[in-house]
């Protein structure tokens, strides 16, 4: 079994660690760095629970080896909190009851955080477009409507639509 020293950035912090060449990125984040917000569900990249941001884009950490992250930037759900307080998207999930058991929540948050900050031309006032956006993240509990309500409450599209209704 071979091991490698990898250097990467995780949540803005430079990290250098020795890892086994077969260690999955999800396991490295959870076991080595103790960032347990990233969940592992299906271990096949289907459920989306392990979604992180890899160089700014959503990626399934259960499908990547830790050594593949060498020289790259990783952002996990822990980075969404601001000074120990919930970030806006996390707060919206809390207020709109966008979670029940919470297992899928980190992956959904990382997907949605990316979508809100990237220029994807998504109409966040459209349930259909939001459902399409989160179709790669499976949730057994909520039925998705409260997740949709949460994303609508923080999206710029919704804020623009609300202000146009007032005019």
Swiss-Prot record:
GO terms for molecular function: 2 iron, 2 sulfur cluster binding; caffeine oxidase activity; metal ion binding; oxidoreductase activity. Optimum pH is 7.0. Keywords: 2Fe-2S, Iron, Iron-sulfur, Metal-binding, Oxidoreductase. It holds the Pfam family Fer2. The caffeine dehydrogenase activity increases linearly from 25 to at least 66 degrees Celsius. An incubation of 30 minutes at 70 degrees Celsius drastically reduces the enzyme activity to 11% of the initial value, and 77% of the activity remains after 30 minutes of incubation at 42 degrees Celsius. [2Fe-2S] cluster binds at residues 42, 47, 50, 62. Disulfide bonds: none annotated. Residues 4-80 form the 2Fe-2S ferredoxin-type domain. It comes from the Bacteria. Its EC number is 1.17.5.2. PROSITE patterns: 2FE2S_FER_1, 2FE2S_FER_2. InterPro entries: 2Fe-2S-bd (IPR002888), 2Fe-2S-bd_dom_sf (IPR036884), 2Fe-2S_ferredoxin-like_sf (IPR036010), 2Fe-2S_ferredoxin-type (IPR001041), 2Fe2S_fd_BS (IPR006058), Beta-grasp_dom_sf (IPR012675), Diverse_Oxidoreductases (IPR051452). The keyword Amino-acid biosynthesis does not apply. It catalyses: caffeine + a ubiquinone + H2O = 1,3,7-trimethylurate + a ubiquinol; ubiquinone-0 + caffeine + H2O = ubiquinol-0 + 1,3,7-trimethylurate; theobromine + a ubiquinone + H2O = 3,7-dimethylurate + a ubiquinol. Coenzyme Q0 (ubiquinone-0) is the preferred electron acceptor and, to a lesser extent, coenzyme Q2 (ubiquinone-2) can also be used, but oxygen and NAD(P)(+) cannot. Is involved in a caffeine degradation pathway that allows Pseudomonas sp. strain CBB1 to grow on caffeine as the sole carbon and nitrogen source. Heterotrimer composed of an alpha (CdhA), a beta (CdhB) and a gamma (CdhC) subunit. This is Caffeine dehydrogenase subunit gamma. It comes from Pseudomonas sp. (strain CBB1). The gene is cdhC.
């Amino acid at each position: 079994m071979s091991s490698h020293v990898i250097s990467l950035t995780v949540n803005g912090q430079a990290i250098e660690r020795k890892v086994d060449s077969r260690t999955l990125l999800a396991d490295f984040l959870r076991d080595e760095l103790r960032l347990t917000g990233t969940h592992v569900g299906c271990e096949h990249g289907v459920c989306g629970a392990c979604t992180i941001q890899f160089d700014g884009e959503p990626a399934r950490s259960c499908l990547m080896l830790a050594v593949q992250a060498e020289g790259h930037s990783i952002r996990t759900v822990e980075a969404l909190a601001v000074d120990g307080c919930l970030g806006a998207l996390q707060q919206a999930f809390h207020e709109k009851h966008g979670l029940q058991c919470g297992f899928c929540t980190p992956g959904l948050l990382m997907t949605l955080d990316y979508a809100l900050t990237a220029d994807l031309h998504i109409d966040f006032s459209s349930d259909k477009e939001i459902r399409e956006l989160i179709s790669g993240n499976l949730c057994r509990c909520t039925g998705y409507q409260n997740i949709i309500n949460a994303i609508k409450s923080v999206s710029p599209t919704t804020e623009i639509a609300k202000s146009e209704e007032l005019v």
